[in-house]
């Protein structure tokens, strides 16, 4: 039997939503509420392919949800709020408490709150959304879907840092990894496209957007990933540095007079592609600048690709080979230039990619390898919302 599931991503002043019909996985409507609690809030909803925008003051998440539900009825999307069978909520950090998604109870709410020190910008906002929905729709299941859960299958040798073991025991200092919902979705989809059991596949998933992470997925389980204790670690990103020598932090403090928080802000918001190029964090800008002969833009692209190269080589070694490489997220799905730079020189690994196919695929699903290539290369648009809806059906027992 069909049911309507809401996939929710609540920020501190925003609420993204998708209404999905399950198990068909068809999108009914989607939208975004911005500037919640700020003057001139913006409510946007897509109805029959047309975007409808309304500007009005929305004081909090509860009011935002009520406006969203009223809009569903007003546009004939639902007849009654009881048509909604369940809600699924993106939660950034589940720590070690949540190796899977979870049906939200008062105890689960408390546990999400207890993990807020691991994701101070996100978990409190995600929780605000959950609480508002539980209050307004008390008779349906609400499910929390964690960005970190998929990576909880990593073995100790992958997630432990070479620090005093007591730091892990006392403070939970370890690699958690992020983008898990995306990596899980594209790995499952890759197995479907290849018509092979996921248990037989070694997949390297490259989620490349403004934030980027690489994951080694062996038999459907994450065994390693590039992001760490926070999403700052790993490859070069739009404004994030990725991995650096930790001794640089006190050195930069000494040289610039900045405190630790200020240096951390530089690493998060002024580094990466923006830091190297000096002009932009957007790969599209850097690609056109590089074509015009701007050396720093080209350098930023080269550094970016080389860091991803390292992880592909490393993860192929960890899994004793690789069967498929997946590109996903904004850049991975749309930039043939970045894909080409990442794949260049990997023929020795059995990766033979077709430049023509690579050029033609943009924002759609498809193979970009030659038919004879032992390792397949697939572009797969990610769909975290469908993954959230699937887990809402599963854990909400719909």
From Swiss-Prot:
Reactions listed under catalytic activity: acetate + ATP = acetyl phosphate + ADP
Principal cellular location given in the protein's record: cytoplasm
Binding site for substrate: 90
Record-level GO cellular component terms: cytoplasm
Subcellular location: Cytoplasm
Assigned EC number: 2.7.2.1
CDD domains to which the protein is assigned, alphabetical: ASKHA_NBD_AcK_PK
Keyword annotations of the record: ATP-binding, Cytoplasm, Kinase, Magnesium, Metal-binding, Nucleotide-binding, Transferase
InterPro entries: Ac/propionate_kinase, Aliphatic_acid_kin_short-chain, Aliphatic_acid_kinase_CS, ATPase_NBD
Annotated residues for binding of ATP: 16, 207-211, 282-284, 330-334
Cofactor comment text: Mg(2+). Can also accept Mn(2+).
GO MF term (any one): magnesium ion binding
One Gene Ontology term from the biological process aspect of the record: acetyl-CoA biosynthetic process
Residues binding Mg(2+): 9, 384
Superkingdom of origin: Bacteria
Stated family: Belongs to the acetokinase family.
Subunit structure: Homodimer.
Cited HAMAP family: Acetate_kinase (MF_00020)
Function: Catalyzes the formation of acetyl phosphate from acetate and ATP. Can also catalyze the reverse reaction.
Protein name as annotated: Acetate kinase
Species annotation: Staphylococcus haemolyticus (strain JCSC1435)
Gene name tied to this protein: ackA
